[in-house]
């Protein structure tokens, strides 16, 4: 799997760094081009390997490349504190793109098509190598602003099958009951619209994106499925008030898994290795559970997202 990831990221990183060199610096061969690259903690070794290869390819140019740790989930917040001081190349999740574009923190790639040839690629190559949704999510007003890197930015349920049966994992009610009997918790991040939206999506509510990048929501009304936003919130409160539920800070699921506190959690592929280590032979994953809305069991929704 790591080898496949490397094949995907290598040309994209090379293209991004080549663009940064072209845009930020007009250096002679005896001058040093300074670049800063940010990526997730688990990608640091990979980034070091790829940046080393980049420097080998352009050995006639001197580079000073600094690699820093920055999660895709927090990249926007860090960048927007000081765009000029931010990294030249960084990874982020697709929902951050409108704000980054508005702040001038991303290049309009269409304006630098010729520069991409330094990395032996073209915009047509980038578009052809990725699914349409990933390209669309990185496009604003007809212009592409980022290189798609992954299409796995969604979430589901990890659970320890030695504690939680497949049947128990099917609903929040039975999931929490099984975890409580084992003296364990079920973790989920709720202080994030990206996660708590899953309850509303499951009940038939929607969100949309305005031309100015702001989000529209219909959660205050009645969904097409006949549920009200109040009904959904009551269902969420039933879950979160259960003693077996643990509200986990964004990005902290991995730490809670490693601590041994959890029998199950809502997360994505980025926590797969940690979940496997924590649950051992009991490691299992499945769709999100159903939850109670009024008198009905409603399938909790999820999202399909991209990373750049």
Map each language-model feature to its residues.
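Conserved N-terminal structural module of periplasmic/extracytoplasmic solute-binding proteins
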Residues: 10, 23-102, 286, 293-295
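Extracytoplasmic/periplasmic solute-binding protein
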Residues: 136-150, 155, 174-220, 262
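Hinge/lid segment of periplasmic solute-binding proteins
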Residues: 94-155, 167
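Extracytoplasmic/periplasmic substrate-recognition and gating elements
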Residues: 277-308
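Glycine-centered hinge/linker elements that transmit conformational signals in sensory
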Residues: 215-249
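Short helices/loops that flank or line small-molecule/ion binding pockets
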Residues: 76-86, 103, 163, 177-181, ...
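Short helix-initiation/N-cap motifs at beta->coil->alpha
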Residues: 68-78, 172-173, 245-258, 270
